[in-house]
Amino acid sequence: NRIIFVENSGSNAALLDLLSISACEQVCHGFPSKDVILKSGDIVNVDCSTILHGYFSDSSRMFCIGNVSEKNKKLVDVAKECVELGLKQVKPWGHLGDVAQAINDHAMANGYSVVRDVGGHGIGLEFHETPFVSYVIKKGTGMVMARKQC
């Protein structure tokens, strides 16, 4: 159903290039493979992007497959909470460090850490635009978000 929605939305998504699926311990940007069979207990991150009228979109979400351990469920829940807490910090004249610290603090408070080399990014006419959004910079630092960027 998702592929049909993308095709019918008027986008010109090249799904092999714009869909990444990372299973279990893989951090990000995995590729679908007929050799990787998901089973009950696995967790998976699905990252889907489309292009509409020349503009890119990018969305990522973690899912539980079947019955997962409490450890894996907690990871999925905390990852979602980190995203939500980070988004609450996106406001005019706020700093990217405000977003980063909200994410990093919540991850660490729950026994996790963020991957230093992976972060957010700008998006628009190009898939990966500036700024790179590090999740390890401090509140009050980094690029200032202008009113029409938020």
Q: Positions of the model-derived regions?
A:
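Active-site neighborhoods and metal-handling regions in enzymes and metal-associated proteins
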Residues: 1-150
